[in-house]
Amino acid sequence: MQKYDFDLFVIGAGSGGVRAARIAAGHGAKVAIAEEYRFGGTCVIRGCVPKKLLMYASQYGQGFEDAAGFGWHSAATSHSWTSLIAAKDAEIARLEGVYQRLIENANVEIFKGRAQIAGPNRVTVTGASVSARTILIATGARPVMPPVAGANLMITSDDVFDLPVGPPRIAIIGGGYIACEFAGIFNGLGRHVVQLHRGSQVLRGFDDELREHLGDELKKSGIDLRLGVDVVAVERQRGALSVQLTTGDAMEVDAVMAATGRLPNTWGLGLETVDVGLDQNGAIKVDEYSRTSSPGIYAVGDVTNRLNLTPVAIHEGHAFADTVFGGKALPTEHENVPFAVFSQPQAASVGLSEAQARDRYSNVEIYGSAFRPMRAALSGRDEKALVKLVVNGSNDRVVGAHIVGADAAEIIQGIAVAIKARATKADFDATLGVHPTLAEEFVTLRNRR
């Protein structure tokens, strides 16, 4: 039997790669991992974690405003962008250390540098050439710039976390979750925000009613959301940026952020040397066990463009390690995965949208409610929450749940368990609610639309 330097070589130390390395090592495999940037990947370094820290920071302004309705009187407040970024940096450095220690404690050998596949079972990194029985690619994805003049003047979500100054006026291009989240962050921090989206509504792929409701709430929060419009060009003028629109209008801002999509990080990995198949967007094609078209090479996470969420990458990495090194054939599961958008207000979904359910089932029942949350009763804020259940009328099973409102992300996690367990509408009806809460609406919905 041929001998290799490692049983597994992982390229990329993000959430999926680190989980795969640790689990494989726990099964007794000799494992190495290579990372050219920082441990933790997109989620820890320039994604989910720092974004949510900024989201928390941005909510205090609204809290100060709402406090007056509850009898509080406070002096004028101000915000320090530099203090926020410094605190964020310290926390991210701490988490990066946690990730690296997890790898070290699992006795995984670490290579600092860019790894490339040099041929079957062969990887080069930092001048070294090593052999591995199995190679796992977990290199994630990167933001892409729109193909317009002046794109070099734009920033992306990667750049936002390191801005030396928070821009007073910012235009955000896009209608996906990243665009909506950063629009809420900058708006909450007191910046003037214009969100530009060429589509008819934000959050393509989500339930249509949720999309429309969130769009209305974003506008009411103070975001200048413009739909059906795109950017033609960006120019620097008198120390600011001039943004030319397809409507013929122009606006002046201090920063333009592109949040128009992400592409898999497959360039320069040497995939052509081993005939790893890619799709039209450059994502690595894999089967349900994360196997590529090349024997002995696997891929997990955003680089496969299956479902680009951190818990999904972790699940895929864990399933891969158990399958290849743990003797358990575990296909990856992508059904009923909950989604959360940390916009302001938050939006969250699990299961099928109403349109998807009607395409799949002949008998679909819809239950929903839009209402003013209790907090707004005294604050006077003009806002409405939305809850919605999608039910397969043939067997009463709840196949989709959607929510817009405070703590939607926390609420949908519990609802996801119920849907995963194939709960019926009768099960929801028989469950007592916690009163007074937004979440209780899911178990008190009675009127079918």
Curated annotation (Swiss-Prot):
Protein residues bound to FAD: 15-16, 35, 42-43, 51, 115, 302, 310, 435
Compartmental location: Cytoplasm
Co-factor binding details: Binds 1 FAD per subunit.
An annotated Gene Ontology molecular function: glutathione-disulfide reductase (NADPH) activity
Entry binding sites for glutathione: 15, 99
Predominant cellular place of this UniProt entry's protein: cytoplasm
Protein residues bound to NADP(+): 175, 178, 181, 198, 204, 261, 340
Disulphide connectivity of cysteines: 43-48
PANTHER family for this protein: GLUTATHIONE REDUCTASE
Protein name: Glutathione reductase
Organism per entry: Burkholderia cepacia
